[in-house]
């Protein structure tokens, strides 16, 4: 047989196996998840009184965990720190309960080894990075129980963890929990000592709580009346898992419906031919699914009779539609629709992009998609916004793989575009279509940059997710420009997966990509996604059917890649990456045009010119080059600021060129008065249409717009005041620069400059006169807003929480400004002499008779040395700041700070590169002109390709 026949045969066998467990009389179901140490430890702690003695009911499970402790004292699970901590806490508790076991005299020593491991591991645990089900309840519960044995731990996030625990407990309605099934039944072991398990027997289903061995074990431990149903359930699960290794249990059993629905929906989504997959078997599955959906009145949970959830319900409804047993989505919509997205179930901590992607996919398969148009647009907006506001890849709370969210989002969003291309869903706005397009291309860009040399993206299941994503996003016409490279990547991935398909290796810890209390893998899912990835047509849809996206230039991405590819920093990057950044930048252009300017319309000029078409590339490419992606929203925020800075600065340069010293002194006073008034910038002052705005009005409009920017309003007053101060000093420094230029013109360039030393001018006026410092402070205001938004408190915290950190950051800003000023001067020497703008090499330190720099080349070499020095000082200052930050904000948040610094720094490095390139272009052009050739024409600071020849010399606007 060929690969296609083999794929369908594997899919057919999988469905027949799952269907047999579903419909065979007497079957209690099926589950192919790996066994877990955590759940096995809970079962090992179950005891009951027999003949007046307390006896452990499942001693064989304790033997298993006893024999599988690792050399460092831990039980590692998938190898992640959090799983090792949770597993080891549960096993340590089991060891303490079994200490009297005479047949295992080394239990105390083993317990000490576990304690030693936990003492170290808990110090390294950043709970803000953790995504596990109910960890904020489970870990405190285990710690409290260990306290009763005299075992306690102190670690940095202990207080925060217990505050989260107390906050969650305070919100619980125990009477409601005791009354009926809820999602909390899945983790009731976290409430030992709080919950009254005697009030819960009526919630058992087939002897278990939500198919969860750990909760069922906790119930047997704490209920005063023994329940044979629960004991029989646990014994049965141990028997089922005997082939996996003696006397263990998984985190979930049975998973019959979960495995059927997830596996079959994946096979359908990726174009498996159901006619080759035993249609009668599929029909029996559909009838059973419909039976339980009817019983649940249009919704159901992952096990019949358990809490309804949107994930299972949405996928089941979609399957019934394609299997010709349709059921209305009405009850589903009523149950799960929220104001801005669809919820998975009550009590969830946060919304899920994968759940909403599944809901969107399901509604797009409804017989009449337009009936649910408002819900479809709502979910699509939510999913697109998640991608729009996320830096890097989007991770989800149900799967550790960064590609799982990409797969489900791409399937739903591309299907949305396909339906819209058919003439449906007419209320979708052009803005939403644009964001969907950007989201999809963001996925493909990040996947292409992450493929490993063997063609994979990690384990086989993760690689399947990535390949399915590529298949869907390859349907976009924007991918035509990189189609050849895309095909190479896909062939490499298929070769990797084909070898796995035929070899069928045993599951490894790295295959545990699904998130529960600990991570786990599911054999049927691995098979289904593997078959799906190898079968999916690429592209999934004909690009010609995706016709309703806003059109973009087919030539601009190539222009961008070609031009910026000449820069030293981009030369090592392969052509396809440079072209990918060009496509992303081209997609971002319309979004920038959609945002109102922060300046007056009369001041705004050239916003649609080549310079502004090039701007997005100059932010996207440096961040992509160094693997420090920023969100599309963050990208747009930066671009809006750069555009406003450019236009404001350019307007002031043009209109102040003939200003007198008196004019400049008057303007300085107005600036100081404006910024000294605490009520300034609280309201927006308009300018009559019949006149141009004055200089102070332009400055006031810029400052007002920036300080009232919507996405910094939750930044603290201290953070916004720092931004206010940077804006004031920037404009005052610009005036000081103008005053220096007047002196130069009056005195002449051949006269030695006297007054402020070059060092002091560089670190005060020069550093203040760099717009990059405003961009850096503004970026941290954006982060401060995000931090406070996530905290959800009216008590706004500073982005740098201590006096030391504030001082260090301001020191970084000063060094960064000095470096940028010197670098700008280095690349503007010729122009500054031509235009009579003050440049570093005009200071007496460079021009004096004893300076040792009596030639232009020597002066330039000296300035280059200073640039290198200030760059090192800036590097060292930022590095020290980051070192001091981590203990205060945690490793995860510290990475956000680092990314801001890196992206700002790389953006400056790009202008450094651009300056060198432009100097070479101008030099070559002059040589060609002297020979009578055309060369590269320079007009108004533009090369013939339309980009700025250098950064703005007089005010350093783009540093």
UniProtKB/Swiss-Prot annotation:
| Name used for this protein in its record | Bifunctional premutilin synthase
Q: Which GO terms describe its biological process?
A: diterpenoid biosynthetic process
Annotated cofactor note = Binds 3 Mg(2+) ions per subunit.
In this chain, composition skew of type Low complexity spans 934-959
Give the family this protein belongs to, as stated in its UniProt record.
Belongs to the terpene synthase family.
Q: Which residues bind Mg(2+) 2?
A: 649, 653
Domain comment from the record reads as follows: The class II DTC active site contains a DXDD motif from which the middle Asp acts as the catalytic acid in this protonation-initiated cyclization reaction, while the class I DTS active site contains a DDXXD motif that binds divalent magnesium cofactors required for the catalyzed allylic diphosphate ester ionization-initiated reaction, with the first Asp playing a particularly key role.
Drop me one GO molecular function for this one.
terpene synthase activity
Identify the stretch(es) annotated as Disordered. 931-959
Positions annotated as active site in the UniProt record: 311, 649
Give me the segments passing through the membrane: none
Which organism is the protein's source?
Rhodocybe pseudopiperita
**Annotated positions binding Mg(2+) 1:** 649, 653
Q: Where is this region: Class I diterpene synthase?
A: 543-959
Q: Which residues bind Mg(2+) 3 per the record?
A: 824
